[in-house]
Amino acid sequence: MVKRSAFHPATALLFSVLLTATVQAAVLPGNPVISRRAAAESMALLKNRNSTLPLIPADRVAAFGHGAVDFIGGGWGSGHVKTEYNANLNEALERQAEAGRIRYCPEAADAWGGDSKFRPDAAFVNHIRKQADTAVLVISRCSGESKDRSPGAGDWLLTVEEQELLQLLKKAKFRKLIVVLNTAGPVSTSELTDDAVDAILYASLPGMEGAHAAADLLTGTINPSGKLTDTWAVAYEDYPSSKDFIRTADFQEYEEDIFVGYRYFSTFDKEKHKVNFPFGHGLSYTMFEIAAPALSHENDTLVFRVPVTNIGDRSGREVVQLYVSAPQGKLGKPAMELAAFGKTRDLSPGERQELTLRVPLAQLASFDDTGRSGHEGCRVLEAGDYRFFPGNSSWDAIMHSPVLFRQEKLQIIFRASVRLKPSLLPRRLTADGSREALPVIRATAEKTVEIPHDRAIEIEAENFTAAHPNTGIEKFGNQGRRELRCVSRMDHRGRFVEYTLTVRQPGRYAIRFRVSNGRPALQDIMTCEVNGIAQPLRLDVPSTGNGPVRGEWYNFITLAPVTMKLPRGEVKLKLISNGTFINLDSFTIAPAQQSDVLFAAFDREHSRIPLPGFHKRERRFPPNGKIVYGTLRRYPEQLDAFLEQMSDDDLAQLLGGHAGSSHGSAGSLGACDVFEIPPYDTFDGPSGVRSFDSCTSWPCPALLAGSFDPELAETIGAALAREARLNRFDIWLAPGVNIHRNPLCGRNFEYLSEDPLLSGQMGAALARGAASENIAVTVKHFAANNREHRRFQTDSRISERALRDIYLRPFEIIVKEARPLFLMSSYNLLNGRKTAETPELLTGILRDEWKFTGTILSDWGNNSDHVYETLAGNTVKMERGNPAALLEAMRHGELTRGHLKRAAGYLVKSLLQVQLMREKQIKPAPDILPSPPEAGKLK
C-alpha cells in the first residue's frame, strides 16, 4: 500500500486513505465506450457532395494513406496518453464490413502497414480500383508541446507524396472519393474543394476509439453533428496573425486586435473569398429548419427561444448558434460574434424541439481602453441596435432574418481596478480596416547624465535616450516602492541602447556593467561607440546561472571594468549587440585613474544591507499544543493560528512543489510532515490521465469543443476524473483555454477554440464534470500563451481591449461559472512582463475583479523569479520552489512574512477542499448505452 499521509493518530480516522489496494494505473470500464461516442459527436463533416455519405452496404471501400493504419489519437507532450491500443481506420472499416454496412478491401491499407514509406504508383491504385469503387484517403498530422506546426509541406500543406496519391485517386475515377483529415487542427483544403473529392470528414485527434467513431460516421451508424471550432482559411497567409507568428522574434504583435478567427473574416472578407470552411460549419445526413427566435427579457438577460425541426429523413442532432452584430458605436465591433449556442437532442424526422438560449447584457459589452466612449478603463454597452442571427454556422446565420434588441443609452457594465496597457504595440486593426496608432513607450523620459570627475556614478540601463524599436524593458523586482527594471530582448545583432552623457573633464573612464546571463558563457557581446566611434574594448560574460536568491535571468553580477575615452561636452554612448545578449541592469562609470578607489567607495555606500534586527522566525506552537492540518476540517477558523505556528522555513517550503507520490504524477503540493499535510498529486493531461501505465485516451479538447455540447463535456470531465481517482491522483492540470489565435500553435489541440465564449463554456463544463467526481482542475495557461516557439521568452503584445474581450474571457467564464480550485500562470511575457510576476494580472484581475480564491501555480520549470512571483500573487512555484530566495528576500525587506502567509493560506484552503474530495468514495460509472451501432446517443 502506498502511504498518502503522515497523520497524527488522533486525526488518522478523519483522513482515512481512500483505497487500500496497490496503486496501479487502469482504464475505468466503460470509458472507451464514452470516448468513442464523444468523438463521433464532435467530428465535423465538411463536405458531402451529392450525398456521397453515408456509405451503403453495396459500397466496396478501400482505405489509402499511412494514416489508415497509423491513425493518430492524440498529440505529444503533456497531451500524450499511454493507451492499451489506438484503433486505426483499417481495422475500424473491417469491423463495419463484418456488420454488413459496407464491403471492404483491406489490401490497399495493408500496403502501408508493411512499409510506412510505401509510395503507390498508378498500377497499384488501378489494381485496387478493380476491387473497390470507394476510396477513403486518410491524411494525418500530429502536434504537441514545445514546438509549433509548420506552414509548409507535411503540415499545413500536403506532402509531395500525398499530392501524388491524391492525383492518382482522382484519375482512377473511383465512384466515391472521401478524405478523412486526422489532423491536430486546420490544414490546407484547397486541393480538396474540387468536384473530384466527394466528401471530407474532419476527425481531428479523436482518442483511442477515434477511428471507430470515424467509421461510425462514414457508414451513417451515427449522424454527424460536430462543428468546426476554428475558421479554415483558403491559404495560411489569409490569417491576420500569419505575418509574425512563425518569425523568430521574441515577441508577437497582436495587431489584429479583437479580430481573431471568424471575427476577422466576417468583418473583412464579406465576399467569402478567403475561407473554405467557416467557424461553426458541420454537415448532417438530415436537414433541419431553424425558425425565427422569440425574444424575451429576464432581468439583465436576453432570452431567445429557438424552434428547431428535423425536416429530413434521418434522426440527428443540430447545433443552433446565435450570433450578434453589435452597433459600431465609437469603439467599433466585429461584424459577427457568437452570443450563445445550444444543441438539440436526437430528433426523429419531423420532430421539433425549442432551445432556450440566454445572453446576459453584460456579455455584449466591449472594453474601452483608450477612452473613445468617454469611459476609459470601463466595459461599456454602447447604445444602438443589436441584431441577433440564429443559424448552424457563422455563414448560415447571416442568411437568417435578425431579431433586434435596442439599447437606448450607453451603460457602464464594469470599471477596471487595474490596467494592463501594452508599451510596445505600435498599432492595431480597427473595424473600418484602418490601423489605430497606440502609444509606444520605448524608453524612459530623455535624460542627460552628468559624469562627475571625482566619484563613481551608476546609470540604470532602462534610462536610455534612444533604442532599437525591439529593445525591451523588463521588470524584475522591487526595492521598497521602487520597481527594478533591466534592458532585455537584445538578442539580435544590431539592436542597441544609447545614453546621453555630459562630460566636464575629458579623459579615460572605467565602466563596469551589471548583467545576468542564463546561458553558457558569452564572448564579445557588444560594440561600444562613443559619438559614433567604436571603442577598442571586448566584453565577455560568464554564465551567471541560478543563484541562491535569483533565477538564471536575474542573478545579476558586476563585471570587471573596461575603459574608454570620453570627450568633453555632450556624449552619445551607444551599446550595440553583437548577437546573443544579456539582461543589463545598470552600469557604473568612474575616472579610470582612480577607478579602484571610487568603485570601492560606491560599493560601500550602496551595499545591500539586511534589515536591522531581522531574525528568521522559528516554529511557535500555541500553549495548547501544535495545531495539525486535520484540525482545520472541524475548525477552519484556526487557519491563521495554524499558519502562525509555522517557521519562515516551513512557509517557504510550502510555497514550492514536490516530487509526486503517485505513479506518473507531474508533481505534488503540500507534503509537510511536521504539520501532517499530505502530498496531493497533480497529473496531466488534456486528453486523458497521463500515467506510466495505460489509461483512456479521449478526443482532444479542440475536437470535443466541436460537439458544442456542454453536457457531453461534463460527461467527459466526470469519466476522466473517475479514472484519475482510480489511479490515485488529486489535481488535473487542465483544462487549457488559450485562444486559437493562429492555426499553427503546437498546443492548439489541447485548447478549445478561436472563440472565447465557446472556449469558456466548454472549459467550464469540463471543470464541473471533473469536480462532480471529486477531482480538482487547474485552468491554464494564464494568459495569452499562444505560441510554443521560444515559449519562455516570447512577449505577447496585446491591447487591453483584446486582452479583456478575447484572451482573458475564457478564464473569466470558468472562474465565475465553475469556481476552480487551481489556475496556472503561463511561461510567456504579457506586454513586456512575465505573467507569473504580474500583480495586475494575478491579483488585480484574477483575485480582486473576478474574486478567485483558489491557488495559482506557476507553469513547470518556468524562468520567473520566485520572489517576484510571490509579490505578484502567484501561490506555488512548480515543480520546485526556491525557499532560499524567499528567505533572503525577507532578510532584505523585499518580502514580509505576511506575503508568505497570504500565499500559504490560499494553498491550504484549496488543499482542504481537495482532501474532502479525496475522502469521498469513487462512484461507479453511470449506466452508459453501448457504443454504436448498438445504441443511440450517449446520455
Each predicted region: which residue ranges?
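Glycoside hydrolase catalytic-domain context in secreted enzymes
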Residues: 1-7, 21-390, 394, 425-452, ...
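Bacterial N-terminal signal peptides
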Residues: 11-21
